[in-house]
Amino acid sequence: MKTLHFLAFISRFIGSNLNAQNNNENFQKDFNTAEKIFNKVYQNGKDEALTYSKGGYSAALPLILSLYKEDTLNMNLAFKLGVCYLSSKRHRIDAIAYFSKAITAITNNYEGSSYKERNAPLISYKFMGDAYHLNYQFDEAIAVYKKYIAEMAENKNTDKAMLDEANRKIEMCKTAKILVASPVKVKIENLGVTVNSIYADYSPVLSADQQTLFFTSRREGSTGGQKDEEGNFFEDIYSSTKTKTGWSMATGIGAPINTDGNEATVGLSPDGQTILIYKDDNGDGNIYSTSLNGDVWAKPVKLNENINSKYWEPSAFISADGSTLYFTSDRPGGYGGRDLYTSKLSPEGDWAKAVNMGPAINTAFDEDAPFIHPDGVTLYFSSNGHNTMGGFDIFTSLLSDDGTWSEPMNVGYPINTPDDDIYYVVSPDGLKAYFSSFRENGFGEKDNYMATFLAKKETPLTLMQGVVNDESGKVAQDVVITVTDNVSGQVVGVYRTNSKTGKFLFILVPGKNYNITYQAKGHLFNSENMEIPKQSNYYEINRAVSLNPIQVGSKIVLNNIFFDFDKATLRPLSNVELKNLLMLMKSNPNMKVEISGHTDSKGSAEYNQKLSEARAQAVVASLTASGISADRMQAKGYGKSMPAAANKNADGTDNPEGRQLNRRVELKITQIN
């Protein structure tokens, strides 16, 4: 009988050990499977690299959670769960509970990839601080970071990089407390479901009239449908237009811009006709440019070697006048990781050698996503250096008259958050900004947002827009618009109309007298004088411009010919217009013209006749001195006999605007041989 009891005991003992062995083998197998996926999220404790990848955490989380439920005293699993939740964006607050458990069993001999490890690494403190930081619990985060520093000292951890990072995180939390306590007066709105998706949507760029939006998306349906190793769809560029009810449903911009690789928006010209895009180029990362011809985008062209190097260039933006490129690069010779650089457009139309923007802008950390406002002096960019409140923050800096940049200023909370805030563009009037960010009420991983400033003054700029037609009312083709400063004679911008719609758009800064010249082959130029005074307001001006053909009888008003008061002496402000006239005459050597002077109704008919003749003759004399044969031009004065507008209003009062239109010089084609 005793023998039977003994055999039964031995049988149960062996069975129990076999079950334990099987359970142990199953745990080891499941752990190794989870660990392989987990490493997509967490690289190693030494470099504390977290990758915010949907593919990584979402795949690893359920496997590790299942193991943890079987062994809730396993602090290695608690640590890994904390990492997964920390990288999940929407469940970060859940990370705190698991890190709180993990720090109760810290080991200096952590072997996280071993299924036998039941303790957690020292860096659990740092990640716990990150979780508090990202959840706006700044005092708790500071306390945990300080505990982390103390534990490193106690354990004689001499890793200076980790110590510096912890101290820097404390400074970020202190900055965050200050910024959150004094929020910017701003209304932040999600651009909505027609723009944003459940996937990552970011890097918005807009035309100056805020009617056309381009952005980058990793949504399902991307060209080629490929995914990266983290499970994200490849980047494509999408567009949306403003309607009476909001933004239209975003659609892919299509070929030849979107391919089966990665394409992202980085910059847009004010008129919305030129896009700067980022292409992955097998990890090299380069900037390309593409322009709109009617409603068809051209094949993207890679910018030259002064911009694109063998290193990484992830973002760029061109100034509104097209003269300066601001871009990001991690090339050697900078101040840290990624730095901001500038390049000037050469007279030959190429980008010149890049110049680092210097230590006022660049730090030992990363700067990215530059945006230069249409005013030409206000720079916005993202940085995880300077006084960031966490991750990348948006900063602004002003260009002074001596060419130096002011100390960057954090644009504040709630635009900036403890997380990454990047890709920020501002409307010409300065009252709205568009940016991408992760927010708790968003649709996806990152969404595009609009910020409306509630206590900010308008930026004093003038937006010029309109259409250019030919003599028949049809869209004029190949129109070039040249904007010149009449005082300095310097060309400040050259623009082109859309070949399908005839539309144009450009920005004028205040305090200048402009010659705006519209030109197309086979047509007389049309010039406009625009005096933009020093002002405090933002203006939008719409123009319908018509070009007259080069044929007998066609005429134009020379709106940028100026004389001293009551005299026939050409003022220096006329030089740009005289140069345009000279080019017109040289380009059409068989053309003869009449240059006519006109006055308003003030003064005697005899006096006005003499003044108008003298002024017409002054223009002819200038062209003759520049080499145009005198027999091709006839100077004629009409005095006040041919008014272009009424000198008086219907009620008999004076009409200053009409008088100004009447005081003019015209050119008329009289003969073409």
Give a label for each model feature.
Residues 54, 88-89, 135:
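Structural motif corresponding to the intra-repeat A-B loop/turn of tetratricopeptide repeats
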Residues 383, 387-390, 596-673:
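Periplasmic OmpA-like peptidoglycan-binding domain that tethers envelope proteins to the cell wall
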Residues 517-533:
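A short, solvent-exposed loop/turn motif at the edges and junctions
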